[in-house]
């Protein structure tokens, strides 16, 4: 190789200056080329989070009275997870676990409802933003709670808000935020060189509902519901309440469909990891806020045209929402140790993306942990109802640490850990029923033993087996 030598090319100040100027001029070009290459290699991330939906109420396994074609398409063109669980079954604690990849008992105040976010915890969105991603959210991010920087400015744990575009929703109870239009504004705000991570946090189907909207505006029928779950009275008001819940889920799905269409139009769909799930179970008695199957078991579907091998698979591995943050970091090529994030407990799902099989892909994913610390106020001294649980293929074990307390809040303050609803009213009215309907109240609001053990049954059979049949 011909080597330049000092004898043939004597150094001079002018030569060095020229070389430095040339190097400096070329650096922006090299940097842009590297950024463009990184953007091509790193996928976009669209995280779609419904507010209060139980499995199997979105996707291919949803009942006939809930139509979610866009979630179904995500699953059929990607992966459907049959055993996905929330680590904590309330809005803010579950979202904190999603953002950090940590269980709620590892999150300090962030494990609570209506909390202050501790400064020591960074979110995966913040980590991606610090490593070149364009980040933003529309709708509900981490909430309810307060997250601020040291100077008092708001801290956007789910990304900068995009909420200026509004619409006339189907009911007055739904949010006026036009989620899909705000997603378009977010995309328009991004540079061509940047991958993006967007959080679509719908406020639906969180309560309250416009009573009867599912029938009047959604064209639904009460008799389409094959059977009401066994821990609620089977009344017209309960069935109407369920149809209103379904109508709001379908609105979430339509907004998601518009977002997917936007990605397709812009040629970004296959380079986008689309993840669809909910933060916790449906806002009904014995579900949301409680440590039970319907509260923790969530729909989960993913699509990534460029990254998921053998799409259309159905996965039976036990996964937790805390697995999402490490998954997002890995596909983005971000090492958690190079971020402000604390160590994560969740495990990346990319091994499932690359697998050739369906069903149980990883035999080590045979259990998940759930629990809670403190949810809504209402007990003396603002006490919580701490609990832990473990879910396996066959059993769901729950440890209630304060069984002397009311699990859904005390009667004196109206059982505040259960949202007001026609179903809640029906359950409370059943308390004085002389024909044995008091059991509905006991299942939803009564005190519980220190330990509970349930046999896990196929979801299709849950309604037929009943609650009592599951208790060992």
Question: Where do the PLM segments sit?
Answer:
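N-terminal secretory signal peptides that target proteins for export/translocation
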Residues: 1-11
């Amino acid at each position: 190789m011909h080597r330049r030598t000092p004898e043939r090319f004597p150094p001079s100040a002018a030569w060095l200056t020229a070389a430095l100027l040339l190097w400096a001029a070329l650096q922006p070009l090299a940097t842009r080329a590297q950024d463009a290459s990184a953007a091509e290699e790193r996928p976009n991330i669209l995280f779609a989070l419904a507010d209060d939906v139980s499995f199997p109420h979105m996707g291919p396994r949803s009942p006939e009275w809930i139509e979610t074609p866009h979630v179904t398409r995500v699953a059929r063109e990607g992966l459907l997870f049959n055993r996905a669980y929330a680590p904590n079954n309330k809005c803010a604690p579950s979202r904190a676990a999603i953002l950090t990849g940590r269980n709620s008992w590892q999150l300090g105040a962030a494990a609570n409802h209506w909390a202050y976010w501790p400064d020591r915890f960074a979110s995966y969105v913040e980590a991606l933003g610090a490593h070149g991603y364009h980040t933003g959210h529309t709708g509900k991010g981490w909430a309810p709670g307060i997250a601020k920087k040291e100077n008092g400015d708001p801290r956007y744990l789910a990304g900068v808000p995009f909420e200026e575009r509004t619409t006339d929703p189907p009911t007055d109870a739904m949010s006026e935020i036009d989620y899909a239009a705000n997603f378009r504004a977010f995309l328009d705000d991004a540079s061509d060189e940047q991958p993006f991570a967007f959080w679509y946090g719908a406020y639906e189907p969180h309560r309250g509902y416009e009573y009867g909207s599912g029938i009047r505006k959604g064209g639904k029928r009460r008799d389409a519901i094959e059977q009401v779950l066994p821990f609620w009275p089977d009344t017209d008001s309960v069935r109407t309440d369920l149809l209103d819940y379904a109508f709001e889920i379908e609105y979430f799905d339509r907004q998601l469909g518009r977002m997917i269409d936007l990605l397709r139009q812009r040629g970004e769909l296959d380079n986008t990891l689309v993840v669809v799930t909910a933060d916790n179970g449906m806002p009904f008695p014995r579900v949301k806020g409680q440590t039970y199957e319907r509260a923790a078991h969530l729909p989960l579907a993913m699509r990534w045209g460029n990254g998921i091998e053998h799409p259309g698979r159905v996965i039976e591995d036990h996964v937790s929402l805390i697995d999402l943050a490490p998954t997002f970091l890995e596909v983005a090529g971000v090492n958690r140790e190079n971020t402000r994030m604390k160590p994560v407990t969740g495990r990346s799902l990319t091994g499932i993306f690359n697998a050739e099989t369906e069903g149980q892909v990883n035999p080590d994913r045979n259990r998940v942990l759930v629990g809670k610390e403190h949810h809504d106020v209402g007990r003396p001294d603002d006490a919580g109802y701490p609990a832990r649980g473990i879910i396996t293929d066959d059993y769901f074990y729950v440890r209630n640490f304060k069984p002397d307390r009311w699990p859904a809040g005390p009667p004196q303050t109206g059982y505040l850990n259960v949202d007001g609803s026609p179903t809640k009213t029906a359950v409370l009215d059943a308390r004085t029923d002389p024909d044995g309907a008091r059991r509905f109240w006991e299942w939803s609001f009564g005190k519980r033993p220190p330990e509970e053990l349930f046999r896990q049954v196929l979801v299709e059979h849950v309604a037929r087996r009943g609650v009592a049949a599951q208790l060992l």
